[in-house]
C-alpha cells in the first residue's frame, strides 16, 4: 500500500519443523528481505542451538538475511554462528547493545572486532540512545562506540537504522538523525550516502 516501503525484515519461527515451507511462503513476496528473532530475550547459547541453526541454514536458499539482535554477552554465540555459515548474510543489530553510559567493555570491543572479520557480517548503527542510563546522554557519549564500529567494519558494511519507534523511549526521531549526521560529517558525502542508504540497499537487496 505504501510504495516508500522497499523491504521488510520479519519474524519466522526458524525452529519449526516446516521452516522450509514457511520461508518459501514469505520469500514469494519480493518485499520480504530477511528474518530477525529477538535472541536477546533467549539464553546466551540460543544462536548455537541445532534447531536454530537448522533454520538459519535455509535462509541463503531464498536470498534472505538474518539480523542478529543480541546483548554483548551473547556475542560469542554469534561468532560461532557466523563462522558456521560463511555464505549467509548477517546484520548485527544495535551494535550488540553495549552500555553507552559506562566505560567501553573490553569483551564487547574484542568480540565486535572478531565478528567484523567475517565479511558476510554487516553492522547496523542503531539502537544506541536507548542503551544509555536513564536515557540521559550527550553526543560525545556515542563517539567511542561509533569509532570502534567504523574501524572494525569499514564504511561498506555499516548501515544506519533509526530504531523507530523504540528510540522514542529516549529521545525524538529528529535527534537520532541529527546525532548520526553530525558524526558522519567527518566523512565524505559519498561515504555518508553509503551509511545512510546505499549500503542498506545492497545488503538487503532493496
What are the roles of these predicted feature ranges?
Residues 8, 35, 59, 94, ...:
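Divalent metal-coordination and catalytic microenvironments
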Residues 11, 66, 108-112, 137, ...:
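Tryptophan-centric aromatic hotspots in well-structured domains and transmembrane helices
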Residues 15-18, 40-43, 73-77, 97-100, ...:
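Active-site environment of divalent metal-dependent phosphoester hydrolases
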Residues 147-148, 152-159, 168-206:
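Mid-to-C-terminal alpha-helical segments outside catalytic/metal-binding sites
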Residues 33, 48-159:
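Catalytic pocket-lining loop regions of alpha/beta-barrel enzymes
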Residues 10-13, 124-127, 159-161, 196:
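Short beta-strand segments
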